[in-house]
From Swiss-Prot:
Belongs to the TonB-dependent receptor family. Residues 1-37 form the signal peptide. This is Ferric vulnibactin receptor VuuA. Disruption phenotype: Unable to use transferrin or ferric vulnibactin as iron source, but able to use heme, hemoglobin and FeSO4 as iron source. Reduced virulence (increased LD(50)) in infant mouse model. Gene3D superfamilies: TonB-dependent receptor, beta-barrel domain (2.40.170.20), TonB-dependent receptor, plug domain (2.170.130.10). It comes from Vibrio vulnificus. GO terms for cellular component: cell outer membrane. Involved in the uptake of iron in complex with vulnibactin, a catecholate siderophore synthesized by V.vulnificus. Binds and transports ferric vulnibactin across the outer membrane. The energy source is provided by the inner membrane TonB system. GO terms for molecular function: high-affinity ferric iron transmembrane transporter activity; siderophore uptake transmembrane transporter activity; siderophore-iron transmembrane transporter activity; signaling receptor activity. The lineage of its organism: Bacteria, Pseudomonadati, Pseudomonadota, Gammaproteobacteria, Vibrionales. A motif (TonB C-terminal box) lies at residues 670-687. InterPro entries: Plug_dom, Plug_dom_sf, TonB-dep_rcpt-like, TonB_rcpt_b-brl_sf, TonB_rcpt_CS, TonB_sidphr_rcpt. Residues 63-185 form the TBDR plug domain. Residues 190-687 form the TBDR beta-barrel domain. One of its GO terms (biological process) is siderophore-dependent iron import into cell.
Length: 687
């Protein structure tokens, strides 16, 4: 299966664009696509038929032509063909309307919305805020610290799906901006194994292995995988105790799975998996290292999770499934004792999600109904030179959801979905001086409506509307004028209404064209604000909106050449508490990428891509002096595929661009820059 990436066309960037003009362009593309599809191909050199992309991240397996979400899919083959791709961040630069600034507190923005949530750093620690971007591995949603600082290895990965736009109605909490769904490979009933070694500049290394084998033929099988990646930061950081060498970056991932498919129980399958992940590295790779900045805080994360999945086809039309996950996690932030600001956290999570699928014999009705129970607790502590500040938090979520797709006619499908969710959030700072003891319960209904017109198997035109949300909370305001303050406050939940027009086109057997045009209307958007008295806190805004489009194409030009292109267009606007209109931070008007893969001789593969990010503001106040200029990054890889393996030579940031991607905390003294060029090689052997 090849990857789908919302296509980009080569278009000159404009500072602004009107939604009606954008829609006209998209409609024009759609019309031309339909006309093309109705024309018989006359090119005798066309390659084999393009495979159809299948997505699984919305709890239902469906083709891309039946999927309304703006999604990009990377399967194992596509990951292998992406230059230097060994962890999830290597793929995110190929997502339109997504900006990943590099290692630091900030998660990627999605369509201009900060995936980290309304705040980062100490303000977020006290408030216990929730991310807006959900990242899950085998059904377990990662915590903020694991996403921002932790390991997200791509080794032995079956598929990665990146969804742009609210996924709350299907994913639940922490998905109002989007979702990244990662599915690892299951055990196989035949023997297979692989080892991989990689080396590169800045002491980069990767050591990975995998083995899968049957225990009882065609019934019981196991799979084990391991991946370790190391490198040195490109920033010249100091060593100090207790952190050690702040330049050292390391991630480890270990997984084990058992698959049981008893022959005596037809249609029944269960998988039990255990996963350990840990990482360490500087909290940020911003380049200011003068004075004490060289003693960069070091963040360590670790987690251990157990997942139990059941799938049982009860009869021809009904299938029961259940996902149960239990996790324990811990995070540690080490700092220079002369400027001590250590942070530690320990917590645990449990969730269970049963669901029932129905597919009518004629295929006219496709439905699912399910429920989810989630419970988490966390104890954390902030320790400075003079005091320790213990904190605690817990979340309990109960939800029920359903989705029904009904074929009104042979060419019109209607989908209705809804999720009712009740969430109780507690947050307490134990120090009586701060008087923070928050306990709030929220109930919310999240509907979705989708109508799709399919004139033939290779064409889809659709419109959908869906609601998303992010839960509220409480925290301690910081006042830099007073050098502290720490007054308690509360903020409300935020809501988003998402409207999208989408098209899917298969042009002959060699070209795909995908478009999603969106408008997002936010109610009570959460954002860090500075009040007139100097308090810095999370506040709810009256008005915010984003609109734009993702356009993607994939072309099998010949048997040996595959090309792709992606374009993201975006406009954002919000009003501060004082009524001033601003753009959202890290929200460029244009993003784009293009690339391809060429096979030649016998087993050689050349792949390359280039990604463009337009200019954007680094801070919420739209300060011109910390505005980020547009930048490019290019990557290339030459691989040789042989019977029992693959050898590759790769270069990331091929032209060694060193543009600034973010000014941390809006300060010119802390620029975060593109990682320098890395040249490396890898060898994988399959047995």
């Amino acid at each position: 299966m090849a990857a789908l990436r919302p296509a980009r066309t080569s278009v000159a960037e404009k500072k602004t664009f009107k939604l009606h003009a954008l829609s006209a362009v998209v409609m024009g593309l759609c019309a031309s696509g339909q006309a093309y599809a109705q024309t018989e191909s006359t090119n005798s050199n066309k390659k084999e038929e393009m495979p159809v992309v299948v997505v699984i991240g919305e709890k239902t397996e469906r083709t891309i032509y039946d999927t309304s979400s703006s999604v990009q899919v990377f399967d194992q083959e596509t990951i292998d063909n992406t230059p230097g791709a060994t962890e999830i961040d290597d793929l995110l630069q190929l997502i339109p309307n997504m900006v990943d600034s590099g290692q630091g507190n900030s998660m990627p923005t999605v369509r201009g919305i900060d995936g980290s949530g309304p705040s980062i750093g100490g303000l977020a620690s006290f408030a216990g805020t929730s991310p807006r971007l959900n990242m899950s591995i085998d059904g377990r949603s990662l915590t903020y610290s694991e996403i921002a600082f932790g390991p997200r290895s791509l080794w032995d990965m079956q598929q990665v799906e990146v969804y742009l736009g609210p996924q709350s109605y299907i994913q639940g909490r922490n998905a109002s901006a989007g979702a990244i769904v990662m599915k690892t490979n299951d055990p196989t009933h035949h023997f297979e194994s692989a080892v991989k070694a990689g080396v590169g500049e800045r002491n980069y290394s990767q050591t990975a292995a995998m083995i899968s084998a049957p225990i009882i033929q065609d019934e019981l099988a196991f799979r084990l995988s391991f991946d370790q990646q190391k490198r040195d930061s490109f920033v010249d950081l100091a060593s100090y105790e207790p952190a050690g060498d702040a330049k050292k970056i390391e991630m480890n991932s270990v997984r084990g799975k058992l698959l049981y498919e008893p022959s005596a129980l037809a249609g029944f399958k269960t998988t039990l998996g255990v996963s350990h992940m840990d990482s360490r590295g500087p909290q940020s790779e911003s380049t200011n290292v003068v004075g004490n900045e060289a003693f960069r805080p070091v963040y360590e994360t670790k987690s251990l999770s157990t997942a139990w999945d059941i799938s049982w086809q009860l009869n021809e039309v009904l299938t029961f499934e259940n996902n149960l996950v239990y996790s324990k996690f811990a995070f540690d932030r080490y700092t220079n004792p002369l400027q001590k600001g250590d942070y530690t956290a320990e917590g645990k999570e449990f969730h269970v999600e049963p669901l029932l699928r129905y597919l009518s014999l004629g295929g006219r009705v496709n439905a699912l109904v399910g429920a989810r129970y989630y419970k988490s607790s966390q104890d954390d502590e902030y320790v400075d030179a003079t005091s320790a500040n213990p904190m605690s938090g817990s979340t309990k979520t109960q939800s029920a959801f359903a989705e029904l797709t009904y074929a009104l006619t042979q060419s019109i499908d209607v989908t209705v979905a809804g999720r009712y969710e009740k969430e109780r959030v507690k947050r307490k700072v134990s120090d009586p001086r701060f008087k923070l003891d928050h306990d709030d319960t929220l109930s919310v209904f999240l509907p979705k409506f989708d109508i799709a017109f399919k004139p033939d198997m290779a064409q889809t035109f659709g419109f959908k509307v869906a609601k998303g949300y992010n839960s509220g909370g409480a925290g301690l305001a910081f006042n830099p004028i007073l050098g502290g303050g720490f007054s308690p406050y509360q903020f409300e939940e935020e809501y988003i209404w998402n409207y999208e027009f989408y098209t899917r086109h298969r042009l002959g057997n060699s070209v795909e064209l995908m478009t999603n045009t969106f408008y997002n209307d936010f109610d009570s958007m959460q954002m860090t604000q500075t009040l007139s008295n100097g308090d810095v806190l999370i506040a709810n805004l009256d008005n915010a909106k984003t609109y734009g489009a993702e356009i993607g194409t994939r072309w099998y030009a010949t048997d040996s050449l595959e090309l792709f292109a992606n374009l993201g267009l975006l406009k954002t606007e919000y009003k501060e508490v004082n009524g001033t209109s601003k753009e959202l931070e890290r929200a460029p008007n244009m993003t784009g990428n293009l690339g391809g893969q060429y096979s030649f001789f016998d087993g050689f593969e050349l792949s390359a891509n280039a990604a463009y990010t337009g200019d954007y503001f680094s801070d919420r106040s739209n300060t011109e002096i910390v505005k980020i200029d547009a930048y490019w990054v290019a990557n290339a890889q030459l691989a040789y595929v042989f019977e029992n393996g693959r050898a590759a030579l790769f270069a990331t940031n091929l032209f060694d661009s060193d543009k600034t991607t973010l000014y941390a905390r809006g300060s010119l003294n802390e620029p975060l820059k593109q990682q320098p060029r890395m040249i490396g090689a890898s060898l994988q052997l399959n047995f």
